[in-house]
């Protein structure tokens, strides 16, 4: 194969050109995202039912949970019961197809006998808002109609657009607002009016007419077609609907509000279709907006408030810049070591060829282009050029004594086995990653596949393209710069040889010192914090507000606007908008402020500093205020960094445990915004019927409920056609008659004989408080404790809770606990990392043992891996960074990198020993001959990492610790590889020789 590559240069060149062409096509056609496509299969089940909280929990929520738990692949079930409705979200294990999951849920829910049919919705975690549009018009009703009739349908047709949520949208309605005084005047109540309207305003199929020739369907059209007809609807003799009510075309009562720049409008949050390219979808929407604006009234304004693609492009641009700079620095290092322009240029070919061709492999395997892809390629620059350098150096040596083509063949033939060994070892590091079926596993997988693809291409480039080009263009002549600097390198080699000689004479002491270093660094690692993903400065934060009292929407709006104005006055803020009642229940006591900060170069403080400042600055005794940096992974409830659940059946016991947990978290000043969802109560007017009076006066409780429902709720009594759609006709009291308990007491009811009575004659009214919600997790009642952190790792918070778990649960066997959100993902990360590393070590040993036909040599090579981990730990400790998903990814890559140097050294020493040299002499020759290659590849890798380590641009919070871990790991492992591996080789050589005598025999011919 080597001869074929050298003898047929055009064939080889065309093959790699083809790979690069396909790579370029893939690079420009692949889906682009910030991170690997983390689509958590989530299904949301919403059930509406007339009933109080406990009834909803027992008759709906529990029934749904029991059915869901029987479905294969369910990971967690999170439910919330409210008055009159229930919401359950089931999270499936990764790999479960969302469509299959939805069908499984429908099948199971379909077997239940529920009061009403639940709504089942697919909410894959990647379907969150990609772009947000704020719509405003002075004519509010016109805005709502345009959104319903034109804007939403238009946007839904844009390619890539998935679910559209309209925050602050009010459904257009025909409002019949009753006047209680007029009702009393005519001896009527709301239920009477509702029944009369229903009996006169309807459309109904009434049968068929059939004869021998024709068939006719009989339909009765008895509904009003306009407001005037509805107003003239006769209630009783001489009394029309307009006499007892105000009738208008309006919209539903406001339960949710969206505000921007002091204006109240509607926020449209556009999600993307699962697996669709986010920037492409956003581009499609932006291109469609000018067309949309021409189709709607001019007084409707559209403002773009959120654009996810900006962050994606910002991060990718920064990583690509760091990669290009890393390539340049790497080439400078290579030239300084080789001091040969032709050799440097030939080595240079390996980098773009490997990177561009890798895109084709990644695309072929179904992956997208994301930040981790480019980081992986940046981390691999040293690997790509290292293979080429090893081959070029060997060919250059042969060129001194052989003709070019023969030198190229002998050079690659001699070093090919080492290059193959190195490539296989690197692949062994990344193959185990593919077994990680978890969210962190998707991150590891994306990087692992990218690096593994690059390694395969790099190997092909090194053994086929480089020898082919080197045989024709490599100039072995030494220039003046080479001659002037050669003495420096020879001096280093001589000093290393002298040092190595001393080490070999004191090998036991040095090995013991190395073991002490490993022990020290591992002990140091336990003092380094552990996070899932570092928070990055993306110029956006959110402020969550919750009133401690049960406020109205208007009161909550006023409080939230006061805080919004303070935030907008901050010189670091670009703009901000407010959502009140943003959750599923449209709870008016909850609000959210999205804060868009100015770009990093336009403000004085970093995002984390602003968050800390806001936590100190914005405090209100009547509000719970949380300041959060936006999470980088959406879905599965991961807004709060710290999420801890206590599970049980008794709510009072759960509250006590939650209080204890909050107290323990509060002992650490760096744990902030500590809160729980245990004490969410609402003010309530409880109506208790006096059964004796009701029996005496012959009053039906069901009748009372009907009167009150049509008086104070928003119940439909019909609909009115409006062209392509219908407006519900809603009956209730006018707002001014729904403000206090006196309005209730004045309600007129009738007994079974039709005699008018005051409601207060049979009902007692009591002010009370009741739970807003009952929260459940995996079929247990739950209380969730959430918190943020200031300069503290999530691992430290988890340890604090685990160390005090007996105190929190009070040794109560009915209580249990669970972590969710980032802490849960952190556990999955550590577990997956440990399994991947263990499997990688086993595979590396198996491969090296097979390649070297030795049980001992692989162990000598593998000692470099804990040495690298030790260096990485020291680097993180010195710079004050934590272990995180990105750092652990880097450490896995590091294990592959550092094995290269040991292989280069051991391979030569092993060959020399088999040629008859004693171990000391073999090691001195191996060390001296491989020193430059090892130093050059190490420096090349380090300088490739420097831009990532030193950059303060987008994403540095995650990129910098990763690069620092690699740099320090390379330094420690390289220094100790050059010193420890020879000592270990000598120490183990006799044992290896004895073992070989057992299993080696004269080989068959």
Regions found by a protein language model. Give the residues of each.
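C-terminal transmembrane helical bundles of large multi-pass transporters
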Residues: 308, 620-999, 1005
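Membrane-proximal extracytoplasmic
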Residues: 1-324, 369, 442, 640-643, ...
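Interfacial segments of transmembrane alpha-helices in multi-pass membrane proteins
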Residues: 2-10, 274-277, 313-370, 431, ...
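Signature of alpha-helical transmembrane segments and their immediate interfacial
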Residues: 1-32, 413-415, 481-533, 644, ...
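Transmembrane helices with small-residue packing motifs
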Residues: 10-11, 17-54, 96, 110-117, ...
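Helix-loop junctions and hydrophobic alpha-helical segments within the transmembrane domains
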Residues: 305, 312, 316, 392, ...
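Solvent-exposed, membrane-proximal periplasmic/extracellular interface segments of envelope transport
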Residues: 6, 56-125, 181-202, 554-637, ...
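Transmembrane alpha-helices and their membrane-interface boundaries in multi-pass membrane transporters
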Residues: 364, 381-395, 416-435, 442-482, ...
């Amino acid at each position: 194969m080597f001869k074929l590559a050298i003898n047929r240069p055009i064939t080889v060149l065309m093959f790699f050109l083809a790979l690069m062409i396909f790579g370029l096509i893939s690079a420009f056609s692949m889906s682009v995202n910030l991170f690997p496509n983390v689509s958590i299969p989530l299904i949301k089940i919403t059930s509406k039912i007339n009933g109080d909280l406990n009834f909803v929990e027992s008759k709906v929520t529990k029934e749904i949970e029991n059915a869901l738990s029987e479905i294969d692949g369910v990971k967690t079930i999170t439910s919330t019961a409210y008055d009159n409705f229930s919401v359950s979200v089931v999270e499936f294990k990764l790999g479960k197809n969302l469509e299959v999951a939805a069908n499984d849920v429908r099948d199971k829910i379909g077997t239940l006998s529920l009061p009403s049919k639940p709504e089942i919705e697919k909410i894959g975690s990647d379907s969150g808002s990609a772009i947000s549009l704020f719509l405003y018009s002075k004519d509010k009703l016109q805005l709502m109609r345009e959104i319903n009739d034109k804007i939403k349908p238009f946007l839904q047709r844009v390619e890539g657009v998935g679910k559209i949520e309209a925050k602050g949208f009010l459904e257009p309605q025909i409002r019949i607002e009753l006047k209680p005084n007029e009702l009393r005047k005519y001896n009527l109540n709301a239920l009477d009016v509702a029944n009369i309207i229903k009996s006169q305003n309807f459309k109904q199929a009434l049968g068929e007419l059939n004869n021998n020739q024709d068939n006719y369907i009989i339909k009765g059209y008895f509904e009003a077609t306009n407001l005037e007809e509805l107003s003239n609807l006769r209630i009783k003799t001489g009394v029309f609907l307009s006499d007892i009510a105000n009738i208008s075309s309006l919209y539903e009562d406001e339960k949710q509000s969206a505000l921007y720049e002091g204006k109240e409008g509607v926020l449209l949050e556009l999600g993307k279709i699962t697996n669709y390219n986010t920037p492409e979808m956003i581009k499609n929407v932006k291109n469609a907006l000018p067309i949309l604006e021409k189709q709607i009234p001019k007084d409707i304004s559209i403002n773009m408030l959120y654009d996810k693609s900006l962050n994606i492009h910002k991060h990718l641009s920064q990583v690509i810049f760091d990669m290009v700079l890393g390539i340049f620095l790497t080439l400078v290092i290579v030239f300084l070591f080789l001091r040969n322009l032709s050799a440097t240029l030939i080595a240079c070919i390996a980098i773009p060829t490997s990177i561009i061709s890798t895109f084709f492999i990644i695309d072929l395997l179904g992956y997208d282009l994301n930040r981790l892809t480019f980081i992986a390629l940046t981390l691999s620059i040293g690997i790509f050029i290292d293979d080429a350098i090893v081959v070029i150096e060997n060919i250059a040596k042969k060129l001194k004594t052989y003709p070019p083509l023969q030198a190229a063949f002998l050079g690659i033939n001699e070093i090919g086995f080492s290059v193959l060994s190195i490539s296989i070892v690197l692949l062994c590091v990344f193959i185990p990653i593919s077994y990680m079926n978890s969210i962190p596993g998707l991150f590891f997988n994306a990087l692992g596949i990218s690096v593994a693809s690059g390694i395969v291409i790099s190997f092909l480039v090194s053994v086929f393209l480089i020898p082919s080009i080197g045989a024709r263009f490599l100039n072995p002549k030494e220039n003046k710069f080479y001659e002037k600097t050669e003495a420096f390198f020879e001096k280093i080699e001589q000093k290393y040889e002298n040092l190595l000689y001393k080490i070999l004479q004191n090998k036991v002491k040095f090995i013991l010192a190395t073991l002490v270093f490993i022990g020290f660094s591992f002990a140091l690692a336990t003092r380094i914090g552990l996070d899932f993903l570092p928070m990055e400065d993306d110029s956006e934060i959110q402020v969550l507000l919750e009133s401690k009292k049960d406020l109205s929407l208007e009161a909550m709006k006023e409080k939230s606007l006061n805080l919004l104005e303070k935030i907008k006055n901050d010189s670091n803020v670009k703009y901000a908008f407010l959502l009140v009642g943003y959750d599923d229940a449209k709870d008016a006591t909850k609000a959210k402020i999205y804060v868009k900060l100015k770009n990093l170069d336009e403000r004085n403080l970093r995002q984390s500093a602003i968050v800390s400042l806001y936590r100190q600055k914005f405090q209100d005794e009547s509000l719970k205020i949380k300041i959060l940096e936006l999470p980088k992974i959406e879905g599965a409830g991961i807004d709060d960094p710290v999420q801890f659940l206590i599970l049980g059946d008794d709510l009072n016991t759960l509250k006590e445990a939650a209080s204890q947990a909050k107290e323990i978290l509060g002992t650490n000043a760096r744990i902030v915004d500590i809160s729980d969802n245990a004490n969410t109560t609402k003010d309530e007017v409880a109506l208790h019927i006096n059964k004796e009076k009701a029996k005496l006066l012959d009053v039906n409780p069901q009748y009372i409920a009907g009167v009150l429902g049509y008086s104070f709720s928003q119940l439909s009594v019909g609909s009115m056609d409006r062209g392509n759609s219908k407006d519900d006709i809603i009956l209730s009291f006018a707002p001014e008659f729904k403000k206090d308990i006196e309005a209730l007491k004045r309600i007129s009811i009738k007994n079974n004989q039709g005699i008018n009575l005051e409601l207060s004659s049979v009902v007692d009214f009591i002010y009370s408080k009741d739970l807003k919600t009952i929260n459940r997790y995996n079929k247990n009642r739950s209380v969730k404790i959430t918190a943020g952190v200031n300069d503290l790792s999530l691992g430290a918070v988890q340890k604090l809770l685990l160390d005090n778990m007996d105190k929190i649960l009070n040794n109560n066997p009915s209580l249990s606990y669970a972590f969710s959100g980032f802490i849960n993902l952190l556990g999955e990360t550590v577990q997956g990392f440990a399994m991947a590393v263990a499997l990688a070590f086993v595979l590396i040993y198996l491969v090296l043992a097979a390649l070297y036909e030795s049980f001992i040599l692989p162990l000598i090579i593998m000692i470099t891996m804990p040495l690298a981990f030790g260096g990485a730990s020291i680097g993180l400790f010195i710079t004050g960074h934590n272990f995180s998903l990105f750092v652990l990814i880097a450490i896995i890559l590091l294990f592959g990198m550092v094995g290269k140097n040991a292989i280069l050294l051991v391979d030569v020493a092993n060959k020399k020993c088999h040629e008859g040299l004693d171990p000391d002499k073999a090691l001195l020759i191996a060390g001296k001959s491989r020193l430059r290659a090892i130093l050059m590849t190490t420096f090349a890798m380090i300088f490739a990492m420097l831009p990532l380590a030193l950059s303060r641009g987008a994403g540095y919070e995650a990129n910098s610790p990763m690069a620092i871990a690699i740099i320090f790991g390379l330094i420690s492992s390289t220094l100790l590889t050059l010193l420890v591996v020879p000592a270990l080789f000598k120490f183990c050589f006799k044992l290896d020789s004895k073992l070989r005598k057992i299993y080696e025999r004269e080989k068959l011919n």
